[in-house]
């Protein structure tokens, strides 16, 4: 799934997203990585430095220029949080198949590149009138986190889109993020479609499917998923107690039940506790991975990757929807594709 939220303060965000104690994998990229043409333009490449990241979120560019307002009125950025469905987190983090996380990261990056090409905008003066103009570049800090607040397996990526983009005039300007919010369902569907291609190529089978393109892995029961999802249970319980049920209610319930982040003192012990719990639940990730490997080996070449034609069509809304649906072999109404996907356009 994909959730979108504004990043209010630069200092707190830089500390939270780049904190290495949030990770559980020994080989996790503690500092995150820069993504986007906007980052390239600013000379930001490779691993994210926390101090540099904080400066960018404050609107302070490497060349000394400032973008946006100073102080509290400045919007630091937009946090796009891409979360893998629970079954895939269990296979990856409990079972140790890091290829799944790599596949999801690649899918997220592909979506971000599409988003910056089609959704990045700014406001600028054009012949004496302020207009919204397309920029085609974003500055993104991409961070991998592996647990939720209850220290359960929860692989997700924070794509923190800074409030800066280069305008057609070559100047750094504040990003207009309206389309990132408006197209969040489309962005999630694109990510999951790309992810599905990858995991099927690895030999995994698709299980339960739900709205907005989300799907679970076959072989992981709802009981097993729920046992590792107490954080979700807390949010749902709070929602049931609330009078408000409209848009934003889930976000409010999440904030109301959010505990303080706890530093993971012993990652090895945490991993062992996950493994012990999995055994109690009868979750055999090793067997699932072995079956997937055997299935992939029996189908040499696996599922083909996206063709060049589909990639070219990916920037054209309805054409992308049609092409990806044909590529995946899905029909109208398939839960892997949002109903209104073909009507969406940047």
Enumerate the predicted regions with their spans.
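Intrinsically disordered, flexible peripheral segments
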Residues: 1-345
């Amino acid at each position: 799934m994909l959730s979108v939220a504004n990043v209010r303060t630069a200092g707190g965000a830089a500390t939270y997203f780049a904190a290495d104690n949030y990770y559980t994998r020994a080989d996790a990229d503690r500092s995150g990585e820069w993504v986007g043409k906007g980052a390239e333009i600013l000379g930001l490449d490779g691993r994210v430095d926390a101090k540099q990241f904080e400066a960018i979120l404050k609107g302070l560019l490497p060349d000394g220029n400032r973008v946006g307002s100073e102080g509290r009125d400045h919007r630091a950025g937009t946090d796009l949080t891409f979360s893998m469905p629970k079954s895939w987190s269990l296979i990856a983090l409990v079972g140790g198949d890091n290829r799944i996380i790599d596949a999801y990261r690649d899918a997220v990056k592909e979506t971000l590149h599409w988003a910056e090409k089609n959704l990045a905008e700014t406001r600028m003066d054009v012949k004496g009138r302020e207009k919204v103009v397309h920029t085609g570049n974003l500055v993104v800090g991409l961070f991998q986190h592996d647990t939720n607040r209850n220290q359960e397996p929860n692989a997700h990526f924070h794509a923190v889109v800074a409030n800066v983009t280069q305008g057609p005039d070559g100047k750094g300007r504040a990003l207009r993020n309206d389309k990132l919010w408006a197209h969040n369902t489309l962005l999630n569907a694109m990510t999951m479609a790309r992810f599905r291609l990858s995991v099927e190529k690895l030999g995994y089978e698709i299980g339960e499917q739900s709205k907005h393109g989300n799907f679970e892995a076959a072989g992981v029961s709802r009981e097993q998923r729920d046992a590792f999802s107490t954080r979700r249970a807390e949010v749902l319980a709070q929602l049931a107690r609330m009078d408000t049920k409209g848009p934003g209610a889930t976000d409010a319930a999440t904030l109301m039940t959010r505990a303080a982040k706890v530093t993971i003192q012993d990652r090895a012990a945490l991993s062992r506790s996950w493994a012990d719990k999995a055994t109690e639940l009868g979750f055999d990730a090793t067997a699932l991975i072995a079956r997937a490997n055997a299935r992939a080996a029996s189908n040499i070449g696996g599922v083909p990757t996206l063709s060049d034609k589909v990639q070219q069509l990916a920037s054209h809304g309805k054409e992308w929807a049609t092409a990806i649906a044909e590529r995946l072999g899905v029909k109208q109404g398939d839960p892997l594709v949002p109903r209104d996907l073909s009507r969406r356009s940047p």
